[in-house]
């Protein structure tokens, strides 16, 4: 019967008694997946790279010498060299950079000094921005750069991360209300090849050393390789501790959020930066629960910490501790402060929240005396906020308060803001201050700090222009910002919202949340933006709840992982979005409100069973009969669709077996043929009664399958033994005794004739026919034994006594005939036909016993005085015939005994005759005749009985 499985797809086997059955074994090793990963240290969602270009010009009515050019160079100092033991993947991936980068370029006629800033803000306008400050005379050219991009390709060979999936399914819990608190695992996150390098760098022509020019497009790059122990789990933490003169970010301050990504944008760890301790604490996501052997490398933009590293041309120890691994390097820092310049400004920092520019301007560092000083700030693309009261004017009382890093300690300055009137105009884009304030002359020095907020209405990239109009000349300084790579823009104060809801077990599989249905703990949930970039990930809590916080208006994607042992329920059932399932991937829109309707339901995946029966097919018909029993101890192996062994069992005492907890899918069942047994015929009848063969393919589709049977019968050896024993023994004994006694006084004639004839005929014929036909292992032994025993006994006794005085004639005739016939026929025919290993024993024993006894007794007594004639004739005939179809043996002894005594044969005269003796002689004669006749009758009678 072919293709007879209705619920299952199966392949039978062609029966062959010589088939060898084997179990295919599939080595499973843990599949390894190599994922090239470059870690990204990000600040926040949308981050930008800004370049600030500041140009200062001086219009002079008199000939004035310009400040000499200062060529500043920086040379990196390597304090230690670490061996690179990081494995690289097969494909290059971009190295990780800080998510924000800003470059500020300040330009004057004589010198450059860089200043770098890193910004992180998803809601404020700014990407890469270039500022240009201009005046009639250029004094300096300063660039302030920090890395604001989310991910930037670096020209160096990228390090990678190689990852393979974990085999275990560990479900860590990250509750919404109280995130899981893990263990510090600094000792389980290992860093190597740590380096702090200057990106670009400037060589000091005098010393030949490479210097870090903080306001001339230079940034620092922190690089390292790392490995993570497999024992690390979601919620565990590790730290980056930055030293006294070193911090993450650039001109733009580091964001509080510092996430760690792989090359595909998946979040490995979420970092929180604490500016007070200058430490970032990273918390691992469920990524480490899903993968093992995580290793890789990273590159992070960093900057000099301006409040501590304050002096130009000074070497500072840049130190960092990653986990438990510490590294430091001496780096020369230069901010490009020009002390002889009446007006100079710099971007102190860019706020990482609203991307506002926090500016510092130094006025009259040379301490010149002026009769006129009007300080004017013009903003393009930015605005002042008069209500913020962050326009500050400080009077300098000590020349040392003009620190090179443009981050003076304002607590040591004299705040004179209230002494001046700040006049805002041009829609708060212009601020004017008269620094003379009624004085006729003044040589006072000032430090002025301002905050400029991005203006969303502006279509250009923005700039900040400064002028100091004096009685001697008009000084100018300009900071302009241009986008290098795009970023979304929004107000810094935009409200944040939440997104999330619930993952539940849909026990009745109706696709709706019912009151009695509970949440599922430990489900992985990933949040992505509209471009598919991963923003965050979390794990459902013990109640099945999850939540993402701090989100702006927009469209998001939420992905749910399927928990082990579950199947996604039907999505989008009904019209109530609050109680349905949104499937494995859904889209959520935030528009001025939280969105807590993104749910997903799962039900426990049903498990099925497979198996049935292995039986002894005694009649070899390939069908299970009610009298046939199961076979115990048959090994049965189950393989999945890939050929991997997923289960092995043995049949029980009733021949039954089964495999449980199976998903719907394709499987192969392999029966191992028991020793000494032969596979029976397959697919001979109904599916639940036939044999399916040694290997059976089966498909389970939402049901159990208990029709997978197999039958065997015993292997036979044909041994045909035919034993025929035929023994024929014929014994014929004929004994004839004839005694004739005659006594005659005269004229006695005695004639004794004895005839004994014994005839024995024995015929033994043995015919044994054994026919054995055996296909395999046939042994035929035929032994024929035929025994026939024939016994013939003939006894004849004849006694004749004659006494005659004269003329006595005695005649005695004895005839003894013995006939014995024994016929024994033995025919043994054994026919054995065996396909294989058949043993047939045929034994035939034929015994024939024939006994023939013939006894003849003849007694004749004659007494005659005269004229007596005695004649005794004894005839003994014994005939024995034995016929046996086997082996015949005959033995016929014949012993005729006839004795005639003639007492008168020597007489010389005839018996006397006379009247006196006639009666006597006649009586004697007749007596003798009667005796002889009686003897003959008796003998003949016995002869008939024997026959």
Curated annotation (Swiss-Prot):
Basic and acidic residues bias spans: 72-83
SUPFAM superfamilies: Bacterial adhesins, Hypothetical protein PA1324
Propeptide residue interval(s): 914-947
Record carries keyword Ion transport: no
Entries under InterPro entries matching the protein: Adhesin_Fg-bd_dom_2, Adhesion_dom_sf, Fibrogen-bd_dom1, Ig-like_fold, LPXTG_anchor, SDr-like, Sdr_B, SDR_Ig
Compositional bias per record (Acidic residues), positions renumbered to this chain: 685-695, 712-886
Cellular component aspect of the GO annotation: extracellular region
A single GO BP: cell adhesion
The protein's assembly and partners: Homodimerizes; via N2-Domain. Interacts with host NRXN1; this interaction mediates bacterial attachment to host cells.
Name of this chain's protein: Serine-aspartate repeat-containing protein C
Organism of provenance: Staphylococcus aureus (strain Newman)
Gene: sdrC
